[in-house]
């Protein structure tokens, strides 16, 4: 069952016979979507807009929410997060005074779940912490998170190269010695972006294999010169928990100057999703 998000009075539809459950979005400072309620003098206008929307017979008010934009910034974001929550609370209380019953109020994203328990209201919206990843490097992992996602592939090809051989597009890597190179069938079309080649490695047979040359659309080459008995079909760990020395989503994010959200969200539809519980495969999903 899906509830719609109402972000402004212009979205209200008055001439349909269908009743739509809605959650009202209140913009308390992110300036993305929602009824503008960023400053108390301006709140009453938005409160009136929301009141008007709630009188429409084809809208069933189920909830109201806002989104914190710096709840993952530790002390740097505390004052603004508290201001956002105060604005939201003001709107909620004003509507309650008008007799408007909001069943579900929710504000807390992953950062707020970590550090702002008083903002939980009736529901929280867990995002990146569902992956077992902290929302930023700045806040403490008070929830004792354990990364839940591992990205794996297999060795597709193994070749021996002589000193002086070039690898991948642009000939950006030249073998400084005789080398053994494995090709892994994953590339930027799968969300493993070219920037991951910078200081990047994969785990093969429990050992680190440095990425060499540019990452291609569908394939990546790694140096397995010092890893014994590498053969086609061997498991390759691209990122995971880090417990066995493999890179983590946080490592890849730091190397590419981005955030762990982007690393896990970029994993493309060509990659099957295997869901495991207590060591047992529960489901396998193919999106293509």
Q: Language-model segments: what does each one mean?
A:
Residues 1-8, 13:
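Single conserved hydrophobic/aromatic residue that forms the stacking wall/gate
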Residues 2-5, 154, 262:
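Residue-level recognition of specific faces of alpha-helices
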Residues 4, 25-30, 59-62, 123, ...:
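Short glycine- and Lys/Arg-enriched binding-loop motifs that mark or flank ligand-binding interfaces
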Residues 14-21, 28-154, 161-162:
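Active-site loop/helix belt of alpha/beta enzymes
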Residues 153-156, 182:
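Internal, well-ordered alpha-helical scaffold/interface segments
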Residues 160-288:
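C-terminal accessory subdomain/extension
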């Amino acid at each position: 069952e899906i509830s719609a998000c109402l972000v402004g009075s212009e979205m209200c539809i008055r001439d349909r016979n269908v009743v739509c459950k809605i959650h009202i979005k209140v913009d308390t400072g992110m300036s993305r979507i929602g009824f503008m309620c960023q400053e108390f003098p301006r709140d009453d206008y938005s409160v009136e807009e929301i009141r008007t929307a709630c009188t429409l017979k084809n809208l069933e008010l189920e909830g109201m929410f806002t989104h914190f934009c710096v709840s993952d910034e530790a002390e740097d974001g505390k004052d603004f997060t508290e201001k956002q929550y105060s604005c939201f609370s003001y709107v909620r209380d004003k509507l309650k005074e008008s007799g408007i019953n909001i069943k579900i109020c929710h504000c807390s994203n992953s950062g707020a779940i970590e550090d702002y328990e008083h903002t939980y209201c009736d529901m929280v919206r867990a995002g990146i912490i569902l992956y077992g990843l902290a929302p930023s490097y700045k806040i403490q992992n008070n929830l004792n998170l354990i990364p839940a996602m591992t990205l794996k592939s297999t060795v597709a090809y193994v070749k021996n190269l002589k000193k002086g051989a070039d690898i991948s597009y642009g000939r950006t890597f030249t073998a400084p010695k005789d080398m053994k190179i494995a090709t892994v069938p994953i590339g930027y079309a799968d969300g493993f972006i070219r920037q991951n080649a910078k200081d990047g490695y994969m785990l093969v047979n429990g050992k680190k294999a440095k990425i060499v040359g540019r990452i291609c659309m569908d394939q990546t080459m790694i140096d397995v010169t010092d890893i014994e008995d590498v053969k086609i079909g061997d498991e390759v760990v691209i990122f995971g928990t880090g417990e066995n020395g493999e890179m983590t989503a946080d490592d890849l994010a730091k190397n590419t100057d981005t955030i762990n959200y982007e690393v896990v969200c970029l994993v493309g539809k060509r990659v099957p999703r295997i869901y495991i519980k207590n060591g047992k495969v529960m489901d396998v999903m193919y999106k293509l």
